[in-house]
Amino acid sequence: MTISPPERGSTAKSQVEKVDNPATFELFGKPGHFDRALAKGPKTTTWVWNLHANAHDFDSHTSDLEEVSRKIFSAHFGHLAVIFIWLSGAFFHGARFSNFSGWLADPTHVKPSAQVVWPVFGQEILNGDMGAGFQGIQITSGLFHVWRAWGITNETQLMSLAIGALVMAGLMLNAGVFHYHKAAPKLEWFQNVESMLNHHLAGLLGLGSLSWTGHLLHVSLPTTKLMDAIDAGQPLVLNGKTIASVADIPLPHEFFNQDLIAQLYPGFGAGIGAFFSGDWAAYSDFLTFKGGINPVTGSMWMSDIAHHHLAIAVLFIVAGHMYRTNWGIGHSIKEILEGQKGDPLLFPATKGHDGLFEFMTTSWHAQLGVNLAMLGSLSIIVAQHMYAMPPYPYMAIDYPTQIGLFTHHMWIGGFLIVGAAAHAAIAMIRDYDPAKHVDNVLDRVLKARDAIISHLNWVCIWLGAHSFGLYVHNDTMRALGRPQDMFSDSAISIQPVFAQWIQGIHAGAAGSTAPNALAGVSEVFNGSTIAVGGKVAAAAIPLGTADFMVHHIHAFTIHVTVLILLKGVLYARSSRLVPDKANLGFRFPCDGPGRGGTCQVSAWDHVFLGLFWMYNSLSVVIFHFSWKMQSDVWGTVNADGSVQHITNGNFANSAITINGWLRDFLWAQAAQVINSYGSNTSAYGLMFLGAHFVWAFSLMFLFSGRGYWQELIESIVWAHNKLKVAPAIQPRALSITQGRAVGVAHYLLGGIATTWAFFHAHILVVG
């Protein structure tokens, strides 16, 4: 910790400026008001593309960093308003169109639904039998499981949440207008990182987690304990009354009665006194460290989750008191950064992290790049935890939801990480001043970029040739009828020994790292099979040769994605081919006439290519997950305890050839979507075809050149002129960059929607 000099202590002056900047629709209603050229109105059809490209590119509106910061800040409130409206819609559907109460009464037999299709021209066929007499569309978002975990017991509570979320949306919209048009923060407020860290860590994460712990302890714990007892067929008694159904459960506010909640958790009887006297063991019945999962619901123990949030709250409240603001104590981020000088042997950057503080507080693109990389990685980590440590009741046996949440969080993470590279490249072009970064860490990385990229390229070639080589070998041997010469568990075995060792460490650690834990951290690490309602909720995930092979395909595709994105960032400002890239900007088609071979070299083009490889990588990941779980984990548990897996364990023998992936995964599991017509999953059949069409449509933009279209358009304009119906706005072909943008958007949209329909139609039928 560093003690600040006295002059740093007086920063308590107002950091908000009163502005009179009326929010007038006269201005907003004028298209392109933010750009002098666009405000003149359209002369050619290119105008509408430029309008969309620049509407949110605040850097292009003004070079005033304070004004840009205020626009971003205001836009965040608008974004939050949209999120609250979206949440309200989810709550409203749960309140008005769902079988939530029916699902709560029998979660192992009733399927969740929150949408009922009205008959217009026969689409009521989409309403499937959800059980308990309810007809609707099955949802796979996991909302019912989350709501049960919160302690929501009826639709009235959901309607209250729907109304509350709309009120919050209104407040957010109001805040967005107020903090731009009436009282706007000054630039120094946006750059006051210590204050921001203190408030976000202690307030948002610390007090937020503490508040959530309060809800979990006082509402979720008693409510879910009563529901679990009902589901287990052993209802509990409260005040002499048997709680035999969800309707009998007391309302949340009734649990503020200490005597009532103490009948479920005696620790509540100790009151707040035990906290101040240090007798924390009195609370050990509701702040637990059990480990494993609840055998009734197949989810983590609610008392473990409450304990976790309490620990998080304590950590973050402490963390939120570490940074120096108006008082002369605490850390200064600038001083911490400037104290890092780099290892003289491994990384000889004599200036270390000098200049980084200024770069990160004046380049919001740089800051956003870091944040997107972190958040994207976090989303991918969430995807893994949804099945390994299921947090919500009965979610583990809702296989469509499990596949849906895994796929969703993987793709969200992928898009955010590509976005991180995009904004890092924009930061390098618009915000990086080489004169301010001499021999610091950024400068050293840029000086070493040839070594970094060529090594990464070598790694990609090695991984690609070897991982694909294993598959080519196996396909050849199987084609020639020589199974004994294949890489497989039963022939030439290549076991993933490192991964198996890590599984073993996690399985064995439970007794030593957490002495009082009753079970390991997750059943996937050599654990036992947990059955809920006759279905597998969690089980050990055995790894073999097939996993070793596909994991190296993962390594290959991820490294290629990183190669493309990192090359885009490191060569954003200049390269041997185009030394003046920084002057050409983030996106440009080619380096002008007479410079052949310089097309598709901009930082934007690297993001464009990175998106395809991100999609490539994650398609293999979600296919691997989907097939592996159906083959080796998910299934029904027979009376004798044996498990009938959905695809009968065919992964180990089929996933070791390319032909096996095509035949036993893609083709075999497409049976449901291809044969869905005439059934309640027929919408997925239509989506499957429609999304294929959108995907194919993208190829038209990706495979053809701009000149072809310009030539075609000119002949069409000639025909219009002949008929005297020529438009006032001159039609022009899309630019190369615009065409590629339209192409990649439809490629990803078509690919993702195709995969969605393929997964859903299959798992809704067999899962």
Curated annotation (Swiss-Prot):
Q: What is its main location?
A: membrane
Residues that, per the record, bind chlorophyll a': H692
Q: Quote the cellular component terms of the Gene Ontology held in the record.
A: photosystem I; plasma membrane-derived thylakoid membrane
Q: Which UniProt keywords apply?
A: 4Fe-4S, Chlorophyll, Chromophore, Electron transport, Iron, Iron-sulfur, Magnesium, Membrane, Metal-binding, Oxidoreductase, Photosynthesis, Photosystem I, Thylakoid, Transmembrane, Transmembrane helix, Transport
Q: Which GO terms describe its molecular function?
A: 4 iron, 4 sulfur cluster binding; chlorophyll binding; electron transfer activity; magnesium ion binding; oxidoreductase activity
Q: Could you tell me the EC number(s) of this protein? A: 1.97.1.12
Q: How does it assemble?
A: The PsaA/B heterodimer binds the P700 chlorophyll special pair and subsequent electron acceptors. PSI consists of a core antenna complex that captures photons, and an electron transfer chain that converts photonic excitation into a charge separation. The cyanobacterial PSI reaction center is composed of one copy each of PsaA,B,C,D,E,F,I,J,K,L,M and X, and forms trimeric complexes.
**Name assigned to this protein:** Photosystem I P700 chlorophyll a apoprotein A1
Q: Which organism is it from?
A: Synechococcus sp. (strain CC9311)
Source organism lineage?
Bacteria, Bacillati, Cyanobacteriota, Cyanophyceae, Synechococcales
